[in-house]
């Protein structure tokens, strides 16, 4: 509809332009015949018609340009919005079926049942242990003597080997006929077995702790031979005798020193 209307408008513009041409030719003929008043009126009307026609044509061209620009912008918007609203057209039902069949064709083979594998391995291990017990009981060496250890103590390095030699007795390889368990036992010969007896550790009784009693320290002081014990001051003795005697005068400071030390 829009194209049809634009086509009609374009035809009307052509007709108006042709009519204006004819009108201009007529005005020029009148001007030659010296009809100035008629020419002036005709020119004014022609100017009004041309102005209106130019305005109409400008409006039509602007509308046509907008109409042509809109279809070009719409596909770009649809292309940008199409992946957001719809799924990709490449992933159809046919593609889905083909990929599903290819996945089924490339699946791994089914694994064996775990219960059956466990039963077979368990029965095989039981048979091996029974064969090992019967052969070890029937083929034990009779002349084997227990090892003697004169020292009575083993280092910690060989203690683990001694325990292993006790749990795995020696079996001669001549009795093994296609049995892998027996062949692994016969490789452990009597040379590898340790020749030391098991260690016997004696617990040491703890000694009773003796607590020492604190001893009294006596301090002996040396006394001069001249110093003698003085009797108590007698009230009856006169003081002149004390002052007059030179021995008492010399021994008095020594006795005072002893009294200070004893205090």
Swiss-Prot record:
Keywords: Disulfide bond, Glycoprotein, Host cell membrane, Host membrane, Host-virus interaction, Membrane, Secreted, Transmembrane, Transmembrane helix, Viral attachment to host cell, Viral immunoevasion, Virion, Virus entry into host cell. Residues 187-198 are annotated as: Binding to host heparan sulfate. Disulfide bonds join 173-186, 176-182. Residues 73-90, 98-128, 150-166, 231-243, 251-263 have a biased composition (Polar residues). The keyword Aminoacyl-tRNA synthetase does not apply. Residues 204-222 have a biased composition (Basic residues). It comes from the Viruses. InterPro entries: G_prot. GO terms for cellular component: extracellular region; host cell plasma membrane; membrane; virion membrane. Residues 70-166, 192-263 are annotated as: Disordered. Residues 67-263 are extracellular. The chain crosses the membrane at residues 38-66. The keyword Transmembrane helix applies. The record marks 65-66 as: Cleavage. Pfam families: Glycoprotein_G. One of its GO terms (biological process) is symbiont entry into host cell. Residues 1-37 are cytoplasmic. Glycans are attached at residues 72, 80, 85, 87, 92, 127, 139, 163, 199, 215, 233. Belongs to the pneumoviruses glycoprotein G family. This is Major surface glycoprotein G. It comes from Bovine respiratory syncytial virus (strain Wbh) (BRS). The lineage of its organism: Viruses, Riboviria, Orthornavirae, Negarnaviricota, Haploviricotina.
């Amino acid at each position: 509809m829009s194209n049809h209307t634009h086509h009609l408008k374009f035809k009307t513009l052509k007709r108006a332009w042709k009519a204006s041409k004819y009108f201009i030719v007529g005005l020029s003929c009148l001007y030659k015949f010296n009809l100035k008043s008629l020419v002036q009126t005709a020119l004014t009307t022609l100017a009004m018609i041309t102005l209106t026609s130019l305005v109409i044509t400008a409006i039509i061209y602007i509308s046509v340009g907008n109409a042509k620009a809109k279809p070009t912008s719409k596909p770009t918007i649809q292309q940008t919005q199409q992946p957001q609203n719809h799924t990709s057209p490449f992933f159809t039902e046919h593609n889905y079926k083909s990929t599903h069949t290819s996945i089924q064709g490339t699946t791994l083979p089914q694994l064996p049942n775990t219960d059956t594998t466990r039963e077979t391995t368990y029965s095989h291990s039981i048979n091996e242990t029974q064969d090992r017990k019967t052969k070890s009981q029937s083929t034990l060496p009779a002349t084997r003597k227990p090892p003697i250890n004169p020292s009575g103590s083993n280092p910690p390095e060989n203690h683990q080997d001694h325990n292993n030699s006790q749990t795995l007795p020696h079996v001669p390889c001549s009795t093994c006929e296609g049995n892998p368990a027996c062949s692994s036992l016969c490789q452990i010969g009597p040379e590898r077995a340790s020749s030391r007896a098991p260690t016997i550790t004696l617990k040491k009784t703890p000694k009773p702790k003796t607590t020492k009693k604190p001893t009294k320290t006596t301090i002996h002081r040396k006394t001069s031979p001249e110093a003698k014990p003085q009797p108590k001051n007698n009230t009856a003795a006169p003081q002149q005798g004390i002052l007059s005697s030179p021995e008492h005068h010399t021994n008095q400071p020594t006795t005072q020193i002893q009294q200070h030390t004893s205090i």
